[in-house]
């Protein structure tokens, strides 16, 4: 295996989900407006998917976030500042911590492999999180600099083309079944699912690990 591409958030760095949507929903509810939580959360997710799966013109994540908040504010006639609220909520992303084994494993793998990060994120977010945690790799690819999102094939093929690699020479490691397993698998990459919660299941991945140490102790041994 010549190269290993890692997803960033949920794979190398800790992440929480769902808080932003509920905060915006609360902002609306605080104006005395009744909001159906299930419907709101479903549409919150579908808006992101529609703007990342090639159904719309490319937008950086921050712009998607602002537009999504503004859409809900307009619908419910809330006089909120979508850009300000988006930046407030996104500020937490800059503080994400690396998993305990991340730096050690990456440093070890870089001795014998090309190590890249391939993440659905904006450049400034990933750059700051990497700097905060002292993480370095050979190259970093984001949805912002590739102008597309996982799991679209263009995301992965651009990385291959940029490095003169064939799909069978690359291992993709990540926690998302759709983005990090089905996406790269579709173009012929080997895949490793990081199942930190031990939930189990087989979705076409070649390997399953519970933390990054499993790459050194098992997958690449």
Outline where the language-model segments fall:
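Structured helix-beta-strand junction loops
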Residues: 111-112
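Asp-based, Mg2+/Mn2+-dependent phosphohydrolase catalytic module
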Residues: 1-4, 14, 80, 103, ...
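N-terminal helical cap/lid subdomain that shapes the substrate entry/recognition surface
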Residues: 2-100
């Amino acid at each position: 295996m010549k190269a290993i591409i890692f997803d960033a958030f949920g794979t190398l760095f800790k992440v929480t989900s769902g808080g932003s949507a509920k905060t915006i929903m609360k902002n609306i509810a605080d104006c005395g407006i009744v909001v159906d939580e299930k419907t709101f959360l479903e549409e919150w997710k579908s808006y992101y998917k529609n703007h990342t799966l090639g159904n719309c013109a490319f937008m950086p994540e921050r712009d998607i976030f602002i537009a999504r908040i503004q859409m809900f504010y307009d619908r419910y006639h809330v006089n909120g500042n979508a850009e300000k609220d988006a930046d407030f909520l996104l500020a937490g992303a800059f503080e994400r911590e690396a998993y305990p084994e991340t730096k050690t494993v990456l440093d070890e793998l870089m001795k014998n492999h090309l190590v890249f990060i391939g993440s659905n994120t904006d450049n400034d977010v990933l750059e700051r999180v990497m700097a905060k945690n002292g993480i370095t790799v050979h190259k970093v690819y984001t949805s912002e600099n590739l102008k597309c999102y996982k799991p679209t094939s263009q995301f992965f093929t651009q990385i291959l083309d940029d490095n003169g690699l064939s799909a069978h020479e690359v291992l993709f490691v990540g926690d998302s079944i759709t983005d990090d397993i089905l996406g790269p698998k579709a173009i012929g990459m080997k895949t490793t699912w990081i199942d930190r919660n031990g939930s189990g299941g087989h979705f076409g991945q070649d390997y399953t690990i519970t933390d990054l140490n499993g790459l050194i102790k098992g997958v690449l041994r």
